[in-house]
Amino acid sequence: MKEELFKEKSRYITGFVLIIVAGLILYADNLLLFWAVLGGVYAVGFSEALRLFQVKASFSLYLILVLSWVAAYFNGHPIECALISAMVMASIIAYQKEHHSEAILPFLYPGVGFFALFGVYKDFGAVAIIWLLVVVVASDVGAFFGGKLLGKTPFTPTSPNKTLEGALIGVVLASVLGSFVGMGKLSGGFFMALLFSFLTALMAVFGDLYESYLKRKAGIKDSGKILPGHGGVLDRLDSMLFGALSLHVLLYFLEVWKETAVFLGD
């Protein structure tokens, strides 16, 4: 009983600290600061992914991680750096027999998600990150309490504790709340922000499920222990990483569509 109370207390304290830190970083609104902090988080998440995929850590893995993250700071399209890092790792696997084929996986997850998260900030600013946070947090909170109150139907064998009703409530709540934040970012207004929030929330749900699947497959409860009461970095950011990729793609193609419309109009 005492252990459960201590864990619950640790969970709230850690959550409060994370909110304060995230708030200060977004308030500072400095690209270098955001890149540096997120890079450190990525390194921890990458180490956790090595454990999930049962890949042995090596110098070459972390060298590619560091070089690709540095390149992302200077590259106009950070996600490209994630894909290139995966291609470089695949080339090393093909050339040498030092690594198993699974060594490419951490560069895809969580790699692509972290680069997408950096891309959301770099390309679309702090408001887009706040939008993403609102969507993901609302989805998680709505799913938890919705499942507790109304949940009856199991959502998936991957995560037996989650219910279909909870997931739906979470997505609806995230879509509505997210749209109020996102509409200030989009010229299309409320309904386009609602659509983008819905698609991002949907991807966030599957990010959480994928992390649950990996942990179940690896036979572990948490991806790490760095966050008291929460587990590892990936335990906290699984939904965020999938949601970031979704939101970045949506916002990017919206920008391309606008530029194309202007070009054709001229």
Segments and roles (model prediction):
Residues 43-53, 136-152, 164-165, 202-244:
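Acidic (Asp/Glu-rich) catalytic motifs at the cytosolic membrane interface
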Residues 251-266:
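Juxtamembrane boundary at the C-terminal end of a transmembrane helix
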Residues 19, 174-175, 236, 243, ...:
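Hydrophobic transmembrane alpha-helices of multi-pass small-molecule transporters
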Residues 2-163, 167-199:
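Membrane-embedded alpha-helical bundles of polytopic integral membrane proteins
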Residues 23, 60, 152, 220-223, ...:
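Hydrophobic alpha-helical membrane context
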